[in-house]
Amino acid sequence: MKKIILISFVLCMVCSAAEGKKAKKDLWPDGTEISQWFKKEAPNVESLGKKYVLTDHGVKTDSTLLQTDAIQAVIDKAAQEGGGVIVVPKGTFLSGALFFKQGTHLHLEEGGTIKGVDYIRWYPVKDSRMEGQNLKYFAALINAEGLNGFSITGKGTINGNGERFWREFWIRRQYNRQCTNLEAMRPRLVFIRDCKDVTIDSVHLINSAFWTCHLYKCERVKIQDAYFFAPHTPDDAKAPSSDAIDVDVCTDVLIDGCFLSVNDDAVAIKGGKGTWADQDPNNGPNRNILIQNCRYGFVHGCLTLGSESVEDHNIVLRNIHVEKAQRILWLKMRPDTPQKYCYVTIDNITGSAQNLLFVRPWTQFYKQEDRADMPLSICDHITLKNLDVRCSTFFNVGPSDKYKLSNFTFENLKITATKDKSFDTSFIDGVKIENVEVK
């Protein structure tokens, strides 16, 4: 009898442990399970095929020599021979736009640099995507389109060499305050379009003339242990619109263990703009975006939804440390665009920022058109929890007849606000506040 009781007790303990383990599943904000795909995994470069070292195929170790054609020839050769890894050895290689083909990958050895030439004519105009619209625009320095299984790896550097472009941008702004980003004619650093199973690992992506890494209509992208930087000083040579990562109509994106410091948003969730943006097949939602274990220097927003965004669902920013950010979570609400920002969670954040939460209308370069059935924009199920942050303003949020805020949760917050401690949530429909200290 005692033996039966003991066995029953052990079985109960095992079942309880199993239930406990089951209860600890990692979940998206909407309650669905985060799949095992989102585990960080180091790429195996050796498994990607034959290595094509640039200097073994006619590319010179002369940092002043423009070698776009020679480098592209190596990429084309690898593609023609069934694919492989384009290896950038130690040294600096000056280039214009490069186009990767199916089966090819880029690996930058430590001390190896691809440096962008600072003349726009070396970045040909192509069918492209910028600022929430499909249009003709300049190619990036590194381009990948329609590829399955593309990777950029190694401890080397892709340097946009953007200073000439930055200075010319600010000169334009001196005589024309309404000069737009597109009119300034600048190349992005990396543009990856219509690709699946993409890995960017360990590389340094610096000094982009425009956006740093733009993902458009991609699925299953991992950006791991990468370093993103563009300067925010001095005023006449800071890097305008140098977003670190632009996620544009993408599904399943992991950003893990990165450092980000740029003169614009760190991670910007995009997807389309305009009064009929929700009906344009070129636009669409972003789903299942996980940003974790990152460090932030100066940025305009650690996580920004918009300004060109239509629908974002299951967006998580967690386990990060911030220093000198202007905003931690920024929800840009365009009056001219129907927007749905749903199930967004900010969890376990430490450090300092000017604003913790910022939700206001965004009207830069917007164009309101007549639409009888214009949907009301919404921000729904927004959660901030487990934060220990120093800031000037904690709650920089305002009401508007152009959007509705609902189901906001504030839980376990320890906030030091040096300028504005106000926390008026009366205009939010459904608010949960638990263990919040603002001093």
Locate each region found by the language model.
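Glycine-rich beta-solenoid repeat tracts in large extracellular/virion proteins
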Residues: 97-100, 113, 117-118, 140-145, ...
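Short charge-dense sequence patches
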Residues: 21-30, 173-175, 206, 265, ...
